[in-house]
Amino acid sequence: MSDMITAAILGLVEGLTEFLPVSSTGHLIITGELLGFTGPKAATFEVAIQLGAILAVVVLYWDRFWGLLRPQPYVRFAGLRGIMLLLLTSLPASVLGLAAHSTIKAHLFTPSTVAIALAVGAIFMLLVERRTERPRYMTLDEMSPALALGIGCFQCLALWPGFSRSAATIMGGMLLGARRGLAAEYSFIAAVPIMFAATGYDLLKSWTLFTPADLPFFATGFVVSFLSAWAAVKLFIALVGRMTFRPFAWYRLAIAPLVYYFMAY
């Protein structure tokens, strides 16, 4: 299989799974093993193509991000208030991630821990879906500092590889009273600062693995990741109000043993 096809397949997997509550880490592990693309360079590539997925969310929610710099009258999720909410959401995982980065890389990327994270995240989703309380927060403009910080605390669960940042923040938001669609939308927007920072940090530490000859390979993965993430987020937002997350949870339980197998053997 050519390098460009490998890059395109991995970019497609990254884009389709990064913002869905299914764990992009688990899927990239399986795909990388099937394609025979593993090791330090593969890990760096997987980090780099996340930038394509991040850019897709920036494009889709450009008006919201632009509003953070140029607030509009009667829009509360804008300007300094909007920036403050995103900072509150990013703070817990940023602090914990920086403090425990080496430990996470060394001890939480084992076959058993990633597979368990997939299963625990699935059970968490099923439990949240059993709740029947009416949501208290309906739109982004109703977001409160307490809700933003609470979602940020749940986001710390995503530091456990395999748990899924989207699962942690969407389910955490719903548990704290956010409407299903709001929890998903805010999860995508809040992903940009923390993912950009984490991706940048990892790339700075591994930039020596890049060579000019790798540029077409990385560019292919980046572009495919961008396009597939754009389509996945667009479709997910259109459907999220009419569906539950139970199918995602059962799917995670099904692939957890596969992730363990491909990582262990």
Swiss-Prot record:
First and last residue of the signal peptide:
none
Subcellular location(s) per record: Cell inner membrane
Q: Which residues cross the membrane?
A: 42-62, 82-102, 108-128, 143-163, 181-201, 221-241, 248-264
GO terms under biological process: cell wall organization; peptidoglycan biosynthetic process; regulation of cell shape; response to antibiotic
Q: Which GO terms describe its cellular component?
A: plasma membrane
Please report any disulfide bonds recorded for this protein chain, giving both cysteine positions: none
Under catalytic activity, the entry for this protein gives: di-trans,octa-cis-undecaprenyl diphosphate + H2O = di-trans,octa-cis-undecaprenyl phosphate + phosphate + H(+)
Top-level taxon? Bacteria
Q: What EC number(s) does its UniProt record assign?
A: 3.6.1.27
Q: Does the keyword Cell inner membrane apply?
A: yes
Coiled-coil region list:
none
One annotated GO molecular function is: undecaprenyl-diphosphatase activity
Q: How does it sit in the membrane?
A: Multi-pass membrane protein
Q: What is its main location?
A: membrane
Q: What does this protein do?
A: Catalyzes the dephosphorylation of undecaprenyl diphosphate (UPP). Confers resistance to bacitracin.
The record's misc note reads:
Bacitracin is thought to be involved in the inhibition of peptidoglycan synthesis by sequestering undecaprenyl diphosphate, thereby reducing the pool of lipid carrier available.
Q: Which family does it belong to?
A: Belongs to the UppP family.
Q: This protein is called what?
A: Undecaprenyl-diphosphatase
Per the UniProt record, the source organism is Nitratidesulfovibrio vulgaris (strain DP4) (Desulfovibrio vulgaris)
